[in-house]
């Protein structure tokens, strides 16, 4: 199946239809699982980061408002993940010998060199999760493009290798095209609409069309829902 975003109606509501293919995973495996850790702590909306207000999208607080000043409770919630939570998760995966993919927000990784080094030392993949953990829906295209480029440069500088996976999470209608413009990604996970990986035809800004492997993100398994 190829999802063609270049058609006049760019959404594909049909997919594999009634007869999805057998994935034929290596070694006869019945299922492929990608364990993902979203590392966003220190990349969220915060006036200290130059943002207009505090984070409100994702936290243990119910329906929090965004304030145009520091929100100390919200900051503390995010700091827990960086100070304690991430180390607990890394220990559990190390004990079990399981690999992780870290969807790392570049500025969050930059603010915690120790945890970034641990991800690398433990052999976990670091995929790019954007420069900042913000909504990009209304961010101007030139700014979003600059953020993408800066994020990739930061991760390469911190880890010594370029990120091969991409996931924004709070993307815009322009994100996939900008990712295709940058190029070189093994996969893009900014999609929730399927169980199986597939190829997507994406039109770049220069008009050329390129195939991009999509590895869908199973948002219903994200523990933020619980």
Task: Label each PLM-derived region with a short phrase.
Residues 2-215:
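Catalytic alpha-helical scaffold of carbohydrate-active enzymes acting on polysaccharides/glycoconjugates
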Residues 211-226:
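A conserved mid-domain beta-alpha-beta active-site/ligand-binding segment of alpha/beta enzyme cores
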